[in-house]
Design a protein with these regions (language model features):
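Polytopic transmembrane helical bundles with strong interfacial aromatic enrichment
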Residues: 1-158
């Protein structure tokens, strides 16, 4: 149950991050914070840096959630191999996204890099969606098994 909640929260955070990233890109504020990882004003940004800084903060939080999801998935005794692989790929993609995000800023929003950043984000989203799908399947399987054992117990009592 915890893995189901964690993976869904991670996917929701990732969706929010992609939404914010789209806004950053479309509104042209991608270089308002031209240094990485901090803005020129230091740890707490001034108003003109707030949108880009917010994107970076949500990215850091989302990356931690992706890594936590992987850790709990790998630790799970009932998670299938496909779920574990998807969580590993998602974690690798998240680390790649952080690195690529820094390179995008350093290279001043080079179009190819921005496009690759979007593409890798879609891979990350797909892998997390797969992890969520698996986690919902796990909870359905548990309910099915509980019903099945309950039915078996009641039939042996008759």
């Amino acid at each position: 149950m915890f893995l189901k909640t964690l993976s869904f929260a991670t996917l929701a955070s990732l969706f929010s991050l992609m939404f914010i990233g789209g806004y950053v890109s479309a509104s042209g504020v991608g270089l308002t914070c031209p240094k990485w990882p901090l803005c020129p004003a230091g740890f707490v940004p001034m108003n003109e840096f707030i949108i880009e800084y917010f994107h970076r903060s949500v990215a850091a939080t989302t990356a931690l959630l992706v890594l936590a999801t992987m850790a709990f998935t790998l630790k799970s005794k009932i998670a299938p191999k496909g779920m574990k692989m998807a969580s590993i790929i998602a974690s690798g993609a998240a680390m790649g996204q952080i690195t690529l995000g820094a390179v995008v800023i350093i290279e001043r929003l080079h179009a190819v890099l921005v496009t690759v950043h979007l593409g890798l984000g879609l891979v990350l989203f797909a892998m997390m969606l797969l992890v969520v799908s698996y986690s919902y399947g796990l909870s359905s399987n548990k309910k099915r098994e509980a019903r099945k054992s309950s039915l078996q117990e009641s039939s042996t009592k008759s």
